[in-house]
Every structure is written in C-alpha cells, then in structure tokens.
Design a protein with these regions (language model features):
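Terminal low-complexity/charged segments
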Residues: 1-206
Length: 206
C-alpha cells in the first residue's frame, strides 16, 4: 500500500476507538491516538505488512499551555519499503506519564530523554530517564512556553575560583518589545486550501 489516503482508511478501521483524529494534508498523514493505546498503535504500524514503519525517525514534544492536555508527544515514522512517512500524536496532561516505546523502537531511548529534559514529560519503563541536554542540576524545562527565554541562571568560568560558577542572569540591556509586523517579506507559506500565500509584504497597507 503506497497511497496515504488508502492507508488512512485502513488504519481508521484497524485502530477503531484508539484513533481519535486523522488528518491528511499537504501530503502528510497525522494520526492522533489515545495515550493508553500508543504501544498497540506503534506495534501495528511497525508489524503490519501494509504499513511496515520499521524506523522511528524522531520523537519530540510540543507545549500548548492553555489546553487541558498540555503536551503533544509526536512520533515520526518511516517505511523504507513503502517509501512513506507517518506522524503519530498523543496528548498528555501535565504530571501524566506515557508508556515508553523502547521495546518497539530502541532508538526512542534518547528521544524520550530529550522530551523529558525539555518538557518534563515522563516515560514509563524508560530504563535511563535522565536529563540529556541541560547542565547538571538544571531546574525547569526550557521548551515549555512559560519558561523565560533567558533562563534563570547563567554559567561562566570564574578565573579567580578556577571553576565554573552559576549566577543569576544579568542582561546587558532591558527586554525590548516589538509590536509591529516584520518589514521583510516572508516565504510563500502553504495555505490550508493547498494554495500559496499572496505575494507582497503583509506588513504594508495599500
């Protein structure tokens, strides 16, 4: 099966209530599934011969602070035999844990650690769920929308103490708020109807 539309129909029937939403747009298929069924869904996508998504390309998080289920956990899968990609998304609330998929995709180990480090999303049964990108003793989750852009502390080498020290962030200048549109013309973005954005500078009025 090499057509994403046909695959979407097949998966809708196979997954049943586990599939809460499906979207096929701009040549990409995205499935939103129930968090408690994520391992069943991933196993089907990996093992079904019509799917054959053997490779986990990436696993990442996303933060929507105003939403009840604050976080997305997004799995990007690749089938080399079918030459297809698929995106699987799960909604997770703050403080909730999601099952690790290491048993299905061993490459998920470090991806899950990164999502934990950046967003605080916990993965059950990950054998080594430690921070992976931030410094030792780091506090907070840098990719959450409510985390300050500057962070809380800065790290520098103190030549007198001959060691690395932490200290509160000291800004060279105060924050500046830019409340106007960019004067530069952006790239022609793909619109929901599949067309292109109108050319010209959206920041200028006729």
């Amino acid at each position: 099966m090499s057509d994403l539309g046909q695959l979407a129909e097949k998966l809708a029937g196979a997954l049943g209530p586990a599939l809460t939403e499906r979207k096929l747009a701009v040549g990409e298929l995205t499935l939103t599934v129930a968090a408690d069924r994520i391992l069943d869904v991933l196993a089907l996508l990996r093992d079904d011969p019509d799917c054959d998504f053997k490779i986990l390309v990436d696993l990442c998080g996303n933060d929507w602070p105003r939403r009840g289920k604050r976080f997305d956990v997004v799995y990007h899968l690749l089938s080399l035999t079918r030459n297809m990609r698929i995106r699987v998304k799960v909604l997770v609330g703050e403080g909730e844990a999601i099952k690790s998929c290491i048993a299905l995709y061993p490459a998920a180990g470090w991806f899950e650690r990164e999502a934990f480090d950046m967003y605080g999303i916990a993965f059950e049964n990950n054998p080594d769920l430690r921070r992976i990108l931030t410094d030792y003793g780091f506090s907070g989750y840098p990719l959450r929308k409510d985390f300050p852009l500057t962070g809380y502390v800065e790290v520098r080498y103190d030549d007198e103490l001959k060691r690395v020290v932490y200290q509160p962030v000291q800004l060279v200048q105060e924050f500046r708020d830019f409340d106007f549109m960019s004067p530069w013309e952006g790239a022609p973005h793909i619109m929901p109807d599949g067309g292109k954005a109108a050319s010209g500078n959206p920041g200028k009025k006729a």
